Amino acid sequence: MSVHDLCCIGYITQDKIVTTKNTIYMPGGTSFYFAHAIKHLDPNGFLLVTSLAHTEMNVVEDIRKEGIEVKALPSARSVCFENIYGENQNERTQRVTAKADPFTMEGLQDVNARIIHLGSLLADDFSLEGIKFLSGKGLLSVDGQTGRKREKL
């Protein structure tokens, strides 16, 4: 059983960014940005766990090319956000346009790390049972993203 020093569990998202000037599509999410920060440090001993649709696996492959170990759990869909910015770039409206399958204890059974960071984006990303399960595997931290105006389709 391999034990990593650090593990981040969270969704790599497919984001639609709408501004007054253009619209772009790009990957995002806590786990995506976490992995890109880690690659500038020593990625040895780091594991990224995500869940996304097969159509987005190219993002995982790009992260792996950066020397990051990734466990990608299959999902029928990826989490998709639409972020709409007006003239004031400090204000946005965010809509959830698709959700991935939830993380399960079964899918995380072989994840072992001294520190596990949950990059939570939505309230139901991790069940209470899953959080309790992971807390028995290592020191647990959670990135709870709240306080944003979100609309769900």
Give, region by region, the residue ranges found by the protein language model:
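Histidine-anchored nucleotide/phosphate-binding helix
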Residues: 29-40
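Conserved phosphate/ATP/ADP-binding segment of small-molecule kinases
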Residues: 135-137, 146-153
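Conserved N-terminal subdomain of the carbohydrate kinase-like
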Residues: 3-4, 14-25, 40-119, 124, ...
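Residues at the C-termini of beta-strands that transition into short coil/loop
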Residues: 10, 74-76, 144
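Active-site metal-binding loops of divalent metal-dependent hydrolases
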Residues: 11-12, 30
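Short, structured patches in soluble enzyme cores that scaffold and shape functional sites
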Residues: 120, 144-146
